[in-house]
Each structure stands twice: as structure tokens, then as C-alpha cells.
Amino acid sequence: MIFAQEKFVDQGQGKWTVTIQDDQWTEFLKKAKNRLKTNLVVPGFRKGKAPESETAKYLTPIKIYNEAFKIVVKPAFDFALSQENKIQNDNSPTPVIVKVSDKEIVIDFIFDLVLELKVGEYKNITTVKKPVVEVNQEDVDNVIDMYRSRFAMQKEKQADDQIQKGDIVTFDFKGYVDDQAFEGGEAKDFVLEIGSNQFVPGFEDSMIGLKVGENQEINVKFPEEYIPSLAGKDAKFVLNIKNIKEKILPAKDDELVKDLNLPDITTYEQLEQKVKEDVLEQKTKISKSEFVENIIDEIIKTSEFQIPKTIIERQIKDVKKEFEDQLAQQKITLDKYKEITKITQEEIDEELKSDAIHRIKSFLVASEIKNKENIVASEEAINAKFEEFANLYGIEADKIKSLIDNQAIKHQVESELLETFIFENNGN
């Protein structure tokens, strides 16, 4: 017997190849033929007693090859196991006939690779710049304006008054693409705050200056990142302005603070400071997560992976389900999506596979770093996280513990610890 082996890392599989030739294979063919003859029933003869001239009519080469394969597959597999295997299998290999004739048989034993990871350098990576987070006055004003909106008064404008940013407008609209009305592009008595960016870019700005009673056409372009059926297309909207109300916000003073009734905040200056701190915390959290994702991408580049096919297929299935759910939410069929985007099923499958493999690699790298650095959530940290949720939702900690699984909290705490570790040990 002759042994060979090959690894297909991109497919998550390997194979052992065993070749049986010449006299050795001839012996297996004889055994197969004799076994078949023993159980062969030929009309006019007792079972297994027909002469060679008669059995030859029934025992075709294909039948003999198949029977010989059944006999040889176990010794061939045992032979493969006895060799110096540099490729370890993660499941029971599947035997496949590659080639068969009177002279030889070639059998492949195909199997999933064992999951392996050799993680690259994960400290002192300087190819990604550490973010600098700043909070400006506009950031603070935007949050405070949201607070002010809670207590805003609305005053109806006069007939000749024009729409301005911040106004509340009631109107009818109907949209057209290529002079054809499109689904979801029409509404009656729609209420919109101008400047809320609720509509596509340019829509609300085009309404500024219009008056009650005006029937006006406006032109916009849908963003490239939009519902596929409308993405990047020019559109026309016919508007009928019915009512305009001015939103009158309360002053930025201590009276606003009283109305908000926030804990430990009694003056407007304290409110501004608290908002600034909250915005800084939020921005820092977002930029930190983005930085860590970029660092993990860098670690992946220098790491070596061997991922079993079954794991890849399982992740592809999950990613595909997410993709299909997104299309369903947008009420678009897969065929329609392909028609709009001009991409093939093969391209979609390749993209989903690439996404799936990247997710697996990111998870493996994160898990390996966590193990190497012994990042484990302490009981104190877990309890502190429960307290954090309790304060957030205004529920007692014991009640929160009955609602949220302890393992889920442990996982979240460890994820945060890992993120902090990667953040503190990388960047410039």
C-alpha cells in the first residue's frame, strides 16, 4: 500500500490517500469475486454452485470493484492510521474511490481538520492609531436640546409664514422614481420635525421656505446605502403642506434643570458638565470598540488558523440567515436583490463565506488572548455589573439576578476586560 496526505486549509479539510496495486489488489478482487459467487443465485443452479461460465454473466466488473472496496476499506484505513500523519482528523474520515481498475484502487479518506490556532503578536501593535476623543459644545447642545424638546411648546404659524428648521410640519407626500410611484413612498397627514433627519438627505432642507397650502415638487437622490430597490436613484416627491407649527423650546437655565429632576443636578452649569461627561463616555466607548476591532484585524493577519469545515459551514448558515432576515425586513426577495445589485449567487456566497470566516477568526483570536492572559471575571466584577444593571433599570440587584443569566453577565464582563487589555497594550 502507498500512503499520501494533503491539507486544504481554506476548505477546513484534509485527506489521506491510500493506493493498493498489482498483486495486493488482485487478492482483494479475488476475495470479492468469491464472496459474490457464494451468495449468487443463478436460475437452474443451487445458491453459490453455478459454474464460472454462468457467474461471469452476473458478476460485472463494477459489482466486483464495489465488493472489493468494502473489503479493502478497513485495512486501507488502518494502514493510513499507522503512518506518520502530519494532518490530524477531527471526525470519522469519509472514504471515497478516486480511481479503480483491475490493476489498482486509489481511496481518499476525507476529514475535517482539527481546530488549531497559532495566534500572532497581540501586544505593541502600532499600525493602528489610538483614537483621540473630544467633546465640543455642539455635542453638548444637541443632547440638551433633546432634553428641552420634552417640554417644548408648539405654536401654529400664520398662513404666510415659511417652514424653518425645527418646525413641526403636517403634510401629504407621494414619491416617484422614473415617473413611477414606489411602494412606501406615499403618506397622508405625515408629521415631521424639520432637521430631525428622518427622511433621506436633502428632503427636509428642500422643505425649508415652503408655506401652508403649497403643492410643491422636490427632488432628492437616495443614498447608495439604502433599500436596494431605491439605492442611488433620483426621486421626485410631490408635497402638500397642510400645517406648520413652531416648536418653542424652554430656556437653558435652572428652571429646565428643575423640570428634568435629575439626581444630584440643581443648576444648568451642572447639567452641562454632566452631559459633557456622558457624551465623552459614550464617544470613548464607541471609539474604543472600533480601535479594538481594528487591532484584532491586524492580529488575524499574523495568525495561523486551521478551522474545521463543519464550523465554517455552521457559521455560514448563521450569516446567511442574518442576510435573508435583512432582505425580508426590506421586503425584497433574493432574486430581486441580485437583479438590483447586479451580483451573482456565487458572489453572494463568497461574500457570506468571507464574513463567516472572519467572524470565526475574530472569535478565536479573542478567546486565545483571553486564555493566554488569564482574563477571568471575578465575583466582585460580576456583582458590580449586576448592580450596574439594577441602577440602570431601577430594579433591585436580586431581582436582576433572577432575570439575567449569570453566565451572560460573566461573558460581558470578560469581554469588557479583554477589550480594555487590547486597548491598553496597543496603538500609538
UniProtKB/Swiss-Prot annotation:
Keywords: Cell cycle, Cell division, Chaperone, Cytoplasm, Isomerase, Rotamase. Disulfide bonds: none annotated. The keyword RNA-binding does not apply. GO terms for molecular function: peptidyl-prolyl cis-trans isomerase activity. It catalyses: [protein]-peptidylproline (omega=180) = [protein]-peptidylproline (omega=0). GO terms for cellular component: cytoplasm. Its main location: cytoplasm. One of its GO terms (biological process) is protein folding. It is an enzyme of class 5 (isomerase). Its EC number is 5.2.1.8. PROSITE patterns: FKBP_PPIASE. It is found in: Cytoplasm. Residues 166-250 form the PPIase FKBP-type domain. It comes from the Bacteria. Consists of 3 domains; the N-terminus binds the ribosome, the middle domain has PPIase activity, while the C-terminus has intrinsic chaperone activity on its own. Belongs to the FKBP-type PPIase family. Tig subfamily. Involved in protein export. Acts as a chaperone by maintaining the newly synthesized protein in an open conformation. Functions as a peptidyl-prolyl cis-trans isomerase. This is Trigger factor. It comes from Mycoplasma mycoides subsp. mycoides SC (strain CCUG 32753 / NCTC 10114 / PG1). The gene is tig.
